[in-house]
């Protein structure tokens, strides 16, 4: 078995990842002089400041790619990525420490 591998009965058909979750598509540009790689579960709002995009719109979202994968942004590169909303308790800790708890939109 490969770490992260999921074995399923082929007769069940394709598995849809993140079914029913809110997604959004954004344009991202690397204005830095070094490549920036973002992992599958990294809170996109808190990625490297060299990446330019509508940051406020990404609060509570991560890349909509399989677990363990990443997207690499080369210097000067611009690309469109799809994001998916975090699920569960919707509490964010770590990364760059910009949230450290419940997402603002859900605080009462």
Swiss-Prot record:
Top EC class, one word: hydrolase
Pathway this chain belongs to: Nitrogen metabolism; urea degradation; CO(2) and NH(3) from urea (urease route): step 1/1
GO terms under cellular component: urease complex
Presence of the UniProt keyword Hydrolase in the record: yes
Signal peptide location: none
GO terms for biological process, alphabetical: urea catabolic process
Record's note on what induces expression: By urea.
EC numbers, comma separated: 3.5.1.5
Subcellular location: Cytoplasm
Keyword tags: Cytoplasm, Hydrolase, Virulence
Catalytic activity: urea + 2 H2O + H(+) = hydrogencarbonate + 2 NH4(+)
Database matches in Pfam families: Urease_beta
GO terms for MF: urease activity
Subunit structure: Probable heterotrimer of UreA (gamma), UreB (beta) and UreC (alpha) subunits. Three heterotrimers associate to form the active enzyme. The trimeric urease interacts with an accessory complex composed of UreD, UreF and UreG, which is required for the assembly of the nickel containing metallocenter of UreC. The UreE protein may also play a direct role in nickel transfer to the urease apoprotein.
UniProt similarity note: Belongs to the urease beta subunit family.
Protein name, entry field: Urease subunit beta
Organism phylogeny: Bacteria, Pseudomonadati, Pseudomonadota, Gammaproteobacteria, Enterobacterales
